[in-house]
Amino acid sequence: MKTLDNQTLLYDEDCPLCSLYTTGFIKVGMLDENGKKPFSNLTNEEQIFIDINKASNEIALLDNKNKTVLYGIDSLLKVIGNSFPFIEKIGNVKTIKFFLKKLYSFISYNRKVIIPNKKENGKAIQCIPSFSYKYRILYIVFAIIMTALTLYNFSALLADFPQGNFSRELILSFGQIIFQSIFLLKFDRKTILNYAGNLMTVSLFGSLLLTPILILNLLINI
């Protein structure tokens, strides 16, 4: 791999996925040994030219020599494109980049509900994404649909149970949010949506555990 020298990714150390792929960039040689740095370890000098709010939402790539910063998809395309220029070229196509930015935002704004973590009050600065109603609701809808689809397909394998339909599974998946949210009405909308996001993450991960069985059944019946 071609190493991108003097560049540092500022990652959210409380995000397992962020930690995984930034470490991966270093191990495969895309970045040098100083190619990643926890967001909470930013120096006062770095905070002068880094947009802290933007870096909380989109991983920042710091050019240590020129003191410039790229954010989000631009930073990832820069790192990957240094070793694979064609990927950067494809990623910068207008329509593809638009999709990549939306996908990145969808994951980034929801990363704290996808994999929750304890708050570290002792840190001077924390990498906490801004709350987005749009992306939180989209995540909840996505999780409901995926959970319902998985349960619908799995129910077809249960011979001793009545044949279900997608609408029923959809109502059950959505209904659990409504039922449990009744007990949260005294809280604000953000708290309710955060809880709903965490709830649907559990449901989504649970349904994903059934996926290997569905795949195995599909292969057997080919």
Locations of the language-model features?
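Local sequence-structure signature of Cys/Sec-based thiol-disulfide redox active-site neighborhoods
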Residues: 2-31
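N-terminal G-site of the GST-like fold
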Residues: 31-54
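Thiol/selenol-based redox catalytic cores and closely related redox-interacting motifs
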Residues: 46, 52-157, 208-221
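Membrane-interface interhelical loops and short amphipathic "cap" helices
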Residues: 157-163
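Hydrophobic alpha-helical transmembrane segments
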Residues: 163-171
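Alpha-helical transmembrane segments of integral membrane proteins
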Residues: 170-222
